[in-house]
């Protein structure tokens, strides 16, 4: 079982324009917020942590981080369980006007999502498994806008109410298809995983009528990792070096939602083996990653443990 937390990253994104509150394309922004949430639904090191900030070009700020993991319970009963928790903050700027003057309205949209998955491993050939997974998600988007002044004080209705203190409750249903190759030998360990995910997000409950939202979250992810022992020992076990390469292609509403259609990640790190001792954690990894895609690039640090 593994649990991965990526703790830092920075990338730059394409510019977008601020919106006008009157006919504000608020619905598009809500769908965009759900699109941002889509990036935190499944374990993916390319979006484990993202920070988009391009204030000079009026690009909405975005910060996102996830914590997730998954494991097959046993070889005898190969049920697979996974879970991901994601947090994001999306800060679009709207413009209110009374026909004569304009006022910028900064907003902060915070979202939290929890996604679970349950699947089953079917052996294909030695070291290769096919894994269908059923996924389910719950999430919330909360808006906090500092709206004041005569320009917007006279404006009433769902749009302004939502910007001031609105919430959007979201659920998601879908699934994933995974091919998982694991070849573990004393001289090296190879992991390769190909995953297609499709989760449909939809708002529900007492949501403002003006901001009903939905998002089609689809992605194809190819993840690979090579681990091999070094000449150094710690805790009576060799310290391993780790090489990692990942490519994620975004589909559906995720494609282009943040200014790119795909992301790549190259990583290098070290792994500490504590399996000789009677402790809960058997391995600990620290991986430095370089992430890049169309018009975006950045770095991150990933921390992971195995049980």
Residue ranges and their predicted role:
Residues 59-67, 77-79, 108-114, 128, ...:
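Residues that define the transmembrane beta-barrel architecture of outer-membrane proteins
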Residues 204, 209-307:
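Outer membrane beta-barrel transmembrane domains
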Residues 85-91, 120-122, 136-144, 181-185, ...:
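Transmembrane beta-strands of outer-membrane beta-barrel pores
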Residues 67-73, 114-122, 175-183, 194-198, ...:
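Residues on the lipid-exposed face of transmembrane beta-strands in outer-membrane beta-barrel proteins
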Residues 71-80, 123-130, 182-190, 230-240, ...:
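Short loop/turn motifs that connect adjacent beta-strands in outer-membrane beta-barrel proteins
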Residues 79-83, 130-136, 173-175, 188-196, ...:
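Transmembrane beta-strands of outer-membrane beta-barrel proteins
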Residues 51-62, 90-111, 141-170, 201-207, ...:
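Extracellular/periplasm-exposed beta-strand and loop segments of Gram-negative cell-envelope proteins
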Residues 14-102:
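Short glycine/proline- and aromatic-enriched beta-strand/turn motifs that initiate or cap beta-hairpins
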């Amino acid at each position: 079982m593994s649990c991965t937390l990526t703790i830092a990253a920075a990338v730059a994104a394409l510019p977008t324009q601020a919106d006008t509150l009157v006919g504000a394309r608020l619905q598009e922004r809500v769908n965009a917020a759900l699109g941002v949430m889509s990036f935190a639904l499944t374990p993916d090191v390319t979006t484990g942590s993202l920070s988009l900030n391009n204030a000079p070009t009026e690009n909405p700020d975005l910060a996102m981080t996830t914590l997730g993991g998954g494991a097959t319970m046993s070889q005898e009963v190969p049920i697979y369980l996974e879970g991901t928790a994601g947090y994001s903050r999306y800060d679009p700027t709207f413009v209110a006007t009374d026909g004569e003057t304009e006022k910028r309205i900064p907003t902060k949209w915070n979202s939290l999502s929890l996604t679970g998955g349950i699947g089953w491993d079917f052996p294909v050939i030695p070291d290769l498994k096919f894994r269908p997974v059923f996924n389910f998600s719950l999430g919330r988007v909360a808006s906090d806008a500092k709206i004041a002044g005569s320009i917007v004080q006279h404006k009433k209705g769902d749009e302004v109410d939502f910007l001031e203190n609105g919430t959007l409750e979201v659920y998601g249903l879908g699934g994933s298809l995974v091919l998982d190759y694991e070849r573990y030998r004393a001289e090296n360990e190879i992991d390769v995983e190909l995953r297609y995910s499709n989760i449909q997000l939809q708002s529900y409950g007492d949501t403002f009528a003006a901001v009903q939202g939905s998002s089609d979250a689809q992605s194809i992810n190819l993840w690979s990792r090579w681990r091999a022992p070094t000449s150094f020992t710690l805790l009576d076990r060799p310290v391993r070096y780790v090489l990692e390469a990942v490519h994620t292609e975004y589909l559906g509403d995720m494609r282009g939602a943040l200014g790119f259609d795909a992301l790549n990640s190259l990583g290098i790190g070290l792994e500490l083996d504590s399996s000789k001792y009677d402790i809960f954690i058997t391995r600990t990894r620290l991986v430095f990653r370089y992430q890049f895609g169309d018009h975006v690039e950045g770095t991150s640090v990933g921390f992971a443990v195995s049980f």
